[in-house]
Regions:
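DEDD superfamily 3′-5′ metal-dependent exonuclease/proofreading module
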Residues: 1-172
Length: 172
């Protein structure tokens, strides 16, 4: 039994390198570069993606790659890259206090009741959570958690939100 336990402990040391994957996922890296790349998809559409290259603080034993929804992660021995698609188009910023807003159908936007009092009643209706928004056009990056503010969505109940990809963000 002692020899068996000794061999187990001895070979467990070989498994410690697997923990280096967790270190990368927990932010143990240095960002080396980031850039916007243009690409042509299989269906012929063009798009952009933001590519971040990082130096791992701890080497990993083997290359590993995975795709989660729109994110693509490739962890190499010493370097990791993350590819995030850039969404270009129009998104909605949803106001949380929709009871304080009117929705203007013709303009497809919500405005605060204090301002909407100057709009004819026939052109306004009480806003609902799903239509209490303003529209914003531009380039956006997706996020699963509300890290970057303000956050935008395609639809009210979408799980993935977006933040605007501003020049300040790209140069920081």
């Amino acid at each position: 039994l002692r020899i068996h336990n000794y061999e187990d402990v001895l070979h467990m040391i070989d498994l410690l390198s697997v923990l280096s994957y967790l270190e990368v996922l927990n932010g143990q890296y240095t960002i080396l570069s980031h850039r916007i790349d243009h690409y042509h998809a299989y269906d012929g559409t063009e798009g952009e993606e933001w590519i971040i290259t990082m130096q791992n603080d701890y080497p990993v034993p083997r290359q590993l790659s995975c795709k989660q929804d729109c994110f693509y992660l490739m962890i190499g021995k010493n370097r990791t890259s993350l590819r995030i698609p850039v969404y270009e188009g129009e998104l909605h910023y949803f106001y949380s206090n929709y009871r304080d807003y009117y929705y203007l159908k013709k303009e497809d936007m919500a405005i605060h009741k204090s301002v909407a009092s100057f709009v004819d009643k026939e052109y306004r209706e009480n806003a609902k959570a799903s239509n209490c928004y303003t529209r914003k056009s531009g380039k956006f990056l997706p996020q699963y958690n509300s890290v970057m503010q303000p956050e935008f969505r395609k639809e009210y109940k979408d799980k993935i939100s977006y933040f605007e990809m501003t020049d300040d963000f790209c140069t920081s």
